[in-house]
C-alpha cells in the first residue's frame, strides 16, 4: 500500500469513527447529516446519500472530485454541493460537518434572528471556536442557493446556521470541525436553558482580546 493510500485509509476510518460518535451520542439520527473532508490529492471524501452516520463502511464512502464529479464509492449526498462551495471559498476549510442536531436546529427555526450573527457571544468558546455564525435563509434541502449563499459567506466564517434546517461547521481537520460543531450545539442548548433570564454578554473589549 502506498503512503497516499495509507493516509486515505486512515482518513476513511477517522470519518467513520467521528460519524459513529455523533450518532451514538444523539447528535445525529436516522440518515440525517453529512460529513466531508479534503484528501491530499484535492478530491473530497464524503458520507454517502441516505447513509446512517452510526453505520458507515469506510470503503463505501463517496469520493468526489473538486468539480463535483462522483469518482467512486456510494453515491454522494446532494448536499455535497455546499461542502464544495465552502472548500472553494475558504482555504482554511479542510473538513465540513452538517448535522440536524436538536438544539442548533431548534435555534435555526426561531424568528427574529440576526442573520449576520445568530449567537451574541456570552462564553469565550463561542468566539474562539466559531466566531460569528451567520444565518442562511431557508431553501429546500439540496437547493443550489444554499451553496451560493455559503460561498459568499465562507471566506469570513467557519460556522453557519441554515434556517429551519440545521448547522454547518468547517475546520482545518475533521476532528476540529467536529469539536466546533459540538461547541455550537452546546451553545445553542445554553441559549434555550437561559431563556428569558438576563444574560451577561461578553463586552467588545473581551471579544477583541479573545480574537487577538
UniProtKB/Swiss-Prot annotation:
Pfam families: Aldolase_II. Signal peptide: none annotated. Gene3D superfamilies: Class II aldolase/adducin N-terminal domain. It comes from the Bacteria. Keywords: Carbohydrate metabolism, Lyase, Metal-binding, Zinc. GO terms for cellular component: cytosol. The keyword Lyase applies. Zn(2+) binds at residues 79, 98, 100, 165. Belongs to the aldolase class II family. AraD/FucA subfamily. PANTHER family: 3-OXO-TETRONATE 4-PHOSPHATE DECARBOXYLASE-RELATED (PTHR22789:SF0), FUCULOSE PHOSPHATE ALDOLASE (PTHR22789). Its EC number is 4.1.1.104. The gene is otnC. This is 3-oxo-tetronate 4-phosphate decarboxylase. InterPro entries: Aldolase_class_II_sugar_metab, Aldolase_II/adducin_N, Aldolase_II/adducin_N_sf, OtnC. SMART domains: Aldolase_II. Binds 1 zinc ion per subunit. GO terms for molecular function: aldehyde-lyase activity; metal ion binding. Catalyzes the decarboxylation of 3-oxo-tetronate 4-phosphate to dihydroxyacetone phosphate (DHAP) and CO(2). One of its GO terms (biological process) is pentose catabolic process. It catalyses: 3-dehydro-4-O-phospho-D-erythronate + H(+) = dihydroxyacetone phosphate + CO2; 3-dehydro-4-O-phospho-L-erythronate + H(+) = dihydroxyacetone phosphate + CO2. The active site is at 79 (proton acceptor), 125 (proton donor). Coiled coil: none annotated. Its cofactor is Zn(2+). The lineage of its organism: Bacteria, Pseudomonadati, Pseudomonadota, Gammaproteobacteria, Enterobacterales. SUPFAM superfamilies: AraD/HMP-PK domain-like. The keyword Coiled coil does not apply.
Amino acid at each position: 500500500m502506498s503512503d497516499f493510500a495509507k493516509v486515505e485509509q486512515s482518513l476513511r476510518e477517522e470519518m467513520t469513527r467521528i460519524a459513529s460518535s455523533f450518532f451514538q451520542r444523539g447528535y445525529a439520527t436516522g440518515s440525517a447529516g453529512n460529513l466531508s473532508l479534503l484528501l491530499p490529492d484535492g478530491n473530497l471524501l464524503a458520507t454517502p446519500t441516505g447513509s446512517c452516520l452510526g453505520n458507515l463502511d469506510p470503503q463505501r464512502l463517496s469520493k468526489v472530485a473538486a468539480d463535483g464529479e462522483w469518482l467512486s464509492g456510494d453515491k454522494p449526498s446532494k448536499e455535497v454541493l455546499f461542502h464544495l462551495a465552502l472548500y472553494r471559498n475558504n482555504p482554511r476549510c479542510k473538513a465540513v460537518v452538517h448535522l440536524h442536531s436538536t438544539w442548533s436546529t431548534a435555534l435555526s427555526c426561531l424568528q427574529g434572528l440576526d442573520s449576520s450573527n445568530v449567537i451574541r457571544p456570552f462564553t469565550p468558546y463561542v468566539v474562539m471556536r466559531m466566531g460569528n455564525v451567520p444565518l442562511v435563509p431557508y431553501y429546500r434541502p439540496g437547493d443550489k442557493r444554499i451553496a451560493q449563499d455559503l460561498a459568499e459567506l465562507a471566506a469570513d466564517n467557519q460556522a453557519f446556521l441554515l434556517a429551519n434546517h440545521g448547522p454547518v461547521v468547517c475546520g482545518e481537520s475533521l476532528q476540529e470541525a467536529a469539536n466546533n460543531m459540538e461547541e455550537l450545539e452546546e451553545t445553542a442548548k445554553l441559549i434555550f436553558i437561559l431563556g428569558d433570564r438576563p444574560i451577561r454578554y461578553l463586552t467588545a473589549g473581551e471579544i477583541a482580546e479573545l480574537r487577538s
